[in-house]
C-alpha cells in the first residue's frame, strides 16, 4: 500500500505494487514536485473565521506551492488563523497575505509558535513539522547582512542597530532617541 509521509505529500509506491502502472504515479509525482517549486493562489477564507488548508496527498493542491498567495472572498473583520496541515510537513514557504479587510493573518501548524503576516505583506516561513506541537517560524526574523547592502524606496525599521560606517545618498530621516551618534556632512 502506498504512503504519503514525505514533506511534499508525494505517493511512495510500496515495493512490488502497481506492476505495469507505476509510470502514472511517477508522472504525477514529478508534476507535484514542479508544483512545489512554483506559485499558487488559494481563497483560504471563504468565510470570516479561522481556517485550515491541507496539502493533499498525491494530488495537486495550491498549498503545496513554494510561493503561496492567500486570498479571501470574505472580508476579514479581525486577525484570523490559517492552519497549514498536516502538521508533520517540514518545509519553507513564502506566504503573501492578499486577503480583504486589512487584517493580519496568523499562520500556524500545531500548538507551537505562529507567525503574523499583516495584510499586503509577504513573509518567508519555515514549518518544522513536529506533529501536534509543530511551529511556524519567520525565517528572516534574525537575518544578518554583511558587506554592502542597498535599500531603495521608503520603509520602516524597528529595533535597528548599525555598526561601522553608514552611507546615505539622499534624505535620511531618524526619529526616536539617538545615542552615541556622530554625523558628518558630505
Residue ranges of model-derived segments:
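Exposed extracellular interaction/assembly regions and N-terminal maturation sites
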Residues: 1-9, 13-105, 186
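Surface-exposed, low-helix, low-complexity loop/repeat segments of extracellular attachment proteins
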Residues: 46-50, 59, 67-73, 103-108, ...
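Residues within well-ordered beta-strands of beta-sheet-rich folds
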Residues: 94, 124-126
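Short acidic-glycine-tyrosine-enriched beta hairpin
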Residues: 113-117
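Tight coil/turn sites that cap or link beta-strands
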Residues: 119-122
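Short beta-strand micro-motifs enriched in acidic
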Residues: 126-128, 165
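Extracellular beta-strand-rich, repetitive "passenger/adhesive" scaffolds
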Residues: 130-133
Amino acid at each position: 500500500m502506498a504512503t504519503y509521509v514525505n514533506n511534499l505529500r508525494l505517493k511512495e509506491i510500496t515495493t512490488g505494487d502497481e506492476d505495469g502502472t507505476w509510470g502514472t504515479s511517477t508522472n504525477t509525482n514529478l508534476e507535484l514536485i514542479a508544483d512545489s517549486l512554483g506559485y499558487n493562489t488559494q481563497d483560504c477564507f471563504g468565510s470570516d473565521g479561522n481556517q485550515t488548508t491541507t496539502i493533499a496527498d498525491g494530488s495537486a493542491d495550491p498549498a503545496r506551492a513554494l510561493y503561496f498567495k492567500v486570498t479571501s472572498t470574505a472580508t476579514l473583520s479581525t486577525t484570523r488563523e490559517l492552519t497549514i496541515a498536516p502538521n508533520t510537513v517540514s518545509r519553507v514557504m513564502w506566504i503573501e497575505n492578499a486577503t480583504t479587510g486589512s487584517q493580519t493573518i496568523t499562520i500556524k501548524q500545531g500548538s507551537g509558535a505562529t507567525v503574523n503576516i499583516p495584510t499586503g505583506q509577504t513573509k518567508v516561513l519555515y514549518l518544522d513539522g513536529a506533529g501536534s506541537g509543530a511551529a511556524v517560524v519567520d525565517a528572516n526574523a534574525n537575518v544578518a547582512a554583511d558587506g554592502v547592502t542597498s535599500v531603495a524606496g521608503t520603509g520602516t525599521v524597528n529595533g535597528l542597530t548599525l555598526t561601522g560606517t553608514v552611507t546615505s545618498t539622499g534624505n535620511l530621516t531618524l526619529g526616536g532617541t539617538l545615542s552615541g551618534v556622530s554625523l558628518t556632512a558630505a
